[in-house]
Amino acid sequence: MKAVYIIGTDTDVGKTLICAGLCWALKEKGYNIGYFKPVLSGAKRRGKMLIPQDTEFVVNFAKIKGDIYRLTPFIFEKPASPHIAASDENVDINVNQIKQTFEDLSQNYEFVIIEGCGGLAVPLKEERNQFYMQYQLIKEICNNVILVTTTKLGTINHTLLTVEFAKAYGLCLKGIIVNMYKNEPDEDKVINTITKFTNIPILAKVDFINDFPSDVDENKFKNVFKKCFDDRAIRKIMGVFEC
């Protein structure tokens, strides 16, 4: 089994959409793909049930087999940093449980895409005034990272800071996916600037989908992913799994 951890430069850069697209595109190419999101905050209620909506979307869109509550073992309603949401609900985010769940899931797939909760420096838990951070979990279960960014104002700073943080803490950041791409003149200038500073390959540029997540038109999504995750992009992405 091989895996890659999808992380973002910021909240709302579209990690879930990218994970769904990657899972779907790779399955279309015949790869046995699994999905895992260890921690999710900001879950929505449906009746009495708390739904990990990111996981539900990826599983339904990419037709991945698995119980959403197993694929996301820690779910919190409060839209906050996991260590705060967990503390408010008196829940211990058990890292060993996450590791074991990942190991169990890995037995069923050739490749697993792991979706992070926010960015690298997100605290997952606090115990005796000590923080356990997302980058620590990444290093322990899959030190193989793809960074999702955008071209919006401020993204150069966010992206470069994330890359430098990854280097400082020994993370294997293998590529960048640019999401919400609109093919506007300055966007490629932003992307070129990021590439010159980081020397990290751009794996794909994914077109902006203006009605996500309010209106899930699967055919529209699939057309975008067919274009953006073409054979060339897929070859680059599969190379990332080779850690």
From Swiss-Prot:
The active site is at residue 37. GO terms for molecular function: ATP binding; dethiobiotin synthase activity; magnesium ion binding. ATP binds at residues 12-17, 54, 115-118, 179-180. It is found in: Cytoplasm. Its EC number is 6.3.3.3. Pathway: Cofactor biosynthesis; biotin biosynthesis; biotin from 7,8-diaminononanoate: step 1/2. Keywords: ATP-binding, Biotin biosynthesis, Cytoplasm, Ligase, Magnesium, Metal-binding, Nucleotide-binding. GO terms for biological process: biotin biosynthetic process. It catalyses: (7R,8S)-7,8-diammoniononanoate + CO2 + ATP = (4R,5S)-dethiobiotin + ADP + phosphate + 3 H(+). Substrate binds at residue 41. GO terms for cellular component: cytosol. Transmembrane segments: none annotated. Mg(2+) binds at residues 16, 54, 115. Its main location: cytoplasm. InterPro entries: DTB_synth_BioD (IPR004472), P-loop_NTPase (IPR027417). Belongs to the dethiobiotin synthetase family. HAMAP family: BioD (MF_00336). Catalyzes a mechanistically unusual reaction, the ATP-dependent insertion of CO2 between the N7 and N8 nitrogen atoms of 7,8-diaminopelargonic acid (DAPA, also called 7,8-diammoniononanoate) to form a ureido ring. PANTHER family: DETHIOBIOTIN SYNTHETASE (PTHR43210:SF5). This is ATP-dependent dethiobiotin synthetase BioD. The lineage of its organism: Bacteria, Bacillati, Bacillota, Bacillota incertae sedis, Caldicellulosiruptorales.
